[in-house]
């Protein structure tokens, strides 16, 4: 953020009105390359999009000169007959403009966030809500709830709605026209909002920062209604959050909301007065849970569908919102199947000469690894078949033995690390068995031997590659409880870094 303020020395009262000229400034592309997703050093030699090019100041200057010409944005046209421009592939210039544009479009939000916290101090890190708050919620609050609304974030009916929403933050008409150009040029919004696993290479390599910003802004707009309802119905101080991209440190929360729809909601807010309504979200999926009745959740579902379609022009089909009763059905979230099951216990109460036997059922959080989708993913990656029988990896037989064992062991440890929050560890043992035997069959295939003789020759050292050092980690973090590490290995353990393993969250 300090870099951005150092480069952009302009009056803050005019920042949002003059964004378009920044597209012609060289330092914008230096910034984009500096703190972009690659995290590389500016002007350092690198390969972009698998082309043999160098990101240098000379290429940036050529790009700016080209944009000053009459038809400067024709370089973004993906014409297969003209693959080279000034000796470089045009996809390189397309990526550079997209990255620079993503930096510029973040400026109004970033500077407003900084200015809102000038002279203020954030006293407690707990106020910086994040995805990490999901795990305490599951442990402390989830077991006391009855129903859950499983919601897929709605998406705009038309791309023009994104531009209209940004007009409230950016008044530069030329910049908004350029935004329309990018939206219609790449046609990536549908693949992003529908959360498809197979996204095109253009989004993955060129426009990731730009379209993630648009998606975050879209989610921020769709979630603003919850802030409004919270303020109007409970009169409590509430804040909304907006996440900027590829930041490794927490930012504060933006205390900004446009008060709208006052007359529309005044007569129906009494329907939703539930002090135990909880909401959390990750990626394109959100959860609303409550201790209320099924009728209340049906009202919320009907209300949200009509609200998003009528007031926000979001396409939200009713089948994108499912009502689940936690006692009867598991919830698919963060790659886990989470549910609530009663844990019966018997208590003997002695009162003078009388004794009473009391049956108590305490709800307990049950997190299960989705074994069938997980085995399907492993079968797709050629570690096993659809029945869960391990198979060899012929494509890896050309690598040294140490590399093969390291690759298998690293994948196995990542999966075990991610699903350490499972309440049933037997599924993890089966996954470890698949990786262990698949590695053994791969090595046996390479050395033209049988699996039995190969395992006999390697001995117990082969198994150590696939055993996660969970006890060692716990003894390092909590040295006083190393004696009970065997008991802790059977308990549910949440690691905050599992949110970086995105592939395991989309197994369905």
From Swiss-Prot:
Keywords recorded for this protein, A-Z: Chloroplast, mRNA processing, Plastid, RNA-binding, tRNA processing
Family stated for the protein in its record: Belongs to the intron maturase 2 family. MatK subfamily.
InterPro entries attached to this UniProt entry: Domain_X, Maturase_MatK, Maturase_MatK_N
Protein name per the record: Maturase K
Pfam families linked: Intron_maturas2, MatK_N
TM annotation in the entry: none
Single annotated GO MF: RNA binding
Subcellular location: Plastid, Chloroplast
GO biological process: mRNA processing; RNA splicing; tRNA processing
Highest taxon in the source lineage: Eukaryota
Coiled-coil residues: none
Organism this protein belongs to: Ranunculus lingua (Greater spearwort)
Gene Ontology cellular component list: chloroplast
Function: Usually encoded in the trnK tRNA gene intron. Probably assists in splicing its own and other chloroplast group II introns.
């Amino acid at each position: 953020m300090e870099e951005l303020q150092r480069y952009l020395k302009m009056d803050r009262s005019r920042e949002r009105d003059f964004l378009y000229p920044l597209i012609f400034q060289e330092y914008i592309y230096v910034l984009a390359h500096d703190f972009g997703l690659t995290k590389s050093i500016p002007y350092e030699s690198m390969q972009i999009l698998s082309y043999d090019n160098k990101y240098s100041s000379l290429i940036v200057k050529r790009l700016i000169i080209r944009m000053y010409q009459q038809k400067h944005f024709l370089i973004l046209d993906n014409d297969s007959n003209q693959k080279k421009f000034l000796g470089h592939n045009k996809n390189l210039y397309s990526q550079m403009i997209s990255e620079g544009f993503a930096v510029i479009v973040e400026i109004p939000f970033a500077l407003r966030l900084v200015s809102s916290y000038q002279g203020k101090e954030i006293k407690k890190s707990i106020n910086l809500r994040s995805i990490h708050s999901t795990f305490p919620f599951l442990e402390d609050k989830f077991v006391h709830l009855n129903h859950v609304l499983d919601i897929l974030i709605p998406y705009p009916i038309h791309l023009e709605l994104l531009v209209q929403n940004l007009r409230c933050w950016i008044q530069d008409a030329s910049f908004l026209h350029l935004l329309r150009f990018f939206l219609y040029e790449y046609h990536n919004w549908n693949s992003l909002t529908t959360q498809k696993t197979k996204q095109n290479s253009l989004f993955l390599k060129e426009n990731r920062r730009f379209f993630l910003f648009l998606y975050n802004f879209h989610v921020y707009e769709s979630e603003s209604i919850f802030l409004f309802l919270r303020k109007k119905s409970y009169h409590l101080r509430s804040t909304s959050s907006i996440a900027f991209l590829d930041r490794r440190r927490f930012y504060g929360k933006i205390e900004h909301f446009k008060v709208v729809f006052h007359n529309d909601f005044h007569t129906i807010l009494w329907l939703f007065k539930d002090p135990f309504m909880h909401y959390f979200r990750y990626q394109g999926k959100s959860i609303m849970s409550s201790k209320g009745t099924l009728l209340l959740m049906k009202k919320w579902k009907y209300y949200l569908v009509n609200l998003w379609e009528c007031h926000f022009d979001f396409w939200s089909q009713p089948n994108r919102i499912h009502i689940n009763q936690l006692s009867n059905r598991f919830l698919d979230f963060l790659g886990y199947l989470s549910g609530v099951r009663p844990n019966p216990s018997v208590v003997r109460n002695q009162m003078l000469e009388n004794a009473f036997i009391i049956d108590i059922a305490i709800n307990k959080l049950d997190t299960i690894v989705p074994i069938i989708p997980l085995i399907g993913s492993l079968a797709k990656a050629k570690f096993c078949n659809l029945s869960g029988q391990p198979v060899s990896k012929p494509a890896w037989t050309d690598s040294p033995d140490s590399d093969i064992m390291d690759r298998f062991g690293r994948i196995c440890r990542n999966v075990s690390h991610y699903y350490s929050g499972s309440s049933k560890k037997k599924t993890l043992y089966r996954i470890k068995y698949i990786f262990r035997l698949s590695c053994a069959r791969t090595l046996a295939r390479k050395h033209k031997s049988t699996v039995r003789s190969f395992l006999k020759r390697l001995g117990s050292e082969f198994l150590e590659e696939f055993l996660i050092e969970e006890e060692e980690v716990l003894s390092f973090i909590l040295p006083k409880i190393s004696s009970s590490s065997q008991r802790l290995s059977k308990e549910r353990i949440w690691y905050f870094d599992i949110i970086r393993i995105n592939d395991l969250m989309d197994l369905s």
